[in-house]
Regions:
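Regulatory and interdomain segments flanking nucleotide-handling catalytic cores
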Residues: 1-197
Length: 197
């Protein structure tokens, strides 16, 4: 999914950041780099959704096949049907962009804890437990400390545009060590400041 997100960022006009967690990708697209900057597909929501979903499927299946070639039978049976994606597009004010990514990251954290609990307990054992209770149950009964999971497993990852001095140009990179956005809003805010120039 990270490679799919990176490919989308590299190929979608006006993309400024990608955020990925589990099977969900969020992209920030803008059209205000200059007065002459055009919006991707002139704001046609149907076109944006259909093309971005198609691109995600294309890139994901391409990257998945590469994994199948490298890892063999582990992935082979899962690759026969291929993956497909849906997409949504909506406008939000600049002032709400950071809050949007906070919301997505909070969802990632909740899903991470619940997914780890579901992998270790039956639905009956975890029914009606909140995330704090799930973490306690994992630690007390299985010796698993969710806080010891990798950052990318707990919070997701971002694909960001950085300047690479060695090639003297910008490139998209995957950041697997993103901060907790509620504790470090500057991570997103600094990307937005770069947009404002």
């Amino acid at each position: 999914m990270q490679q799919t997100t990176k490919s989308l960022c590299e190929n979608i006009q006006g993309c400024k950041i990608g955020y990925v967690e589990s099977d969900e990708i969020s992209l920030l697209l803008t059209d205000y780099d200059t007065l002459q900057t055009d919006a991707w597909f002139d704001y046609s929501v149907q076109k944006i959704c259909s093309v971005s979903a198609s691109m995600a499927a294309l890139f994901f299946n391409k990257h998945w096949q590469k994994n199948v070639a490298e890892l063999g039978d582990v992935y082979k049976s899962k690759s026969e049907l291929g993956a497909y994606f849906d997409a949504r597009a909506f406008n939000i004010p600049k002032e709400e962009i950071t809050n949007y990514f906070i919301w997505r990251q909070n969802d990632a954290t909740r899903n991470s804890i619940q997914g780890l609990a579901q992998a270790n307990f039956s639905q009956k054992q975890i029914h009606s437990l909140n995330n704090s209770q799930l973490q306690d149950k994992l630690h007390e009964e299985k010796g698993i400390n969710w806080n010891d999971c990798k950052t990318v497993e707990k919070r997701g990852s971002c694909v960001v545009h950085v300047f690479d001095k060695s090639i003297n140009r910008s490139k998209w990179v995957i950041d697997e060590e993103i901060p907790i956005f509620t504790q470090n809003r500057d991570y997103i805010e600094n990307i937005l400041k770069k947009l404002e120039g």
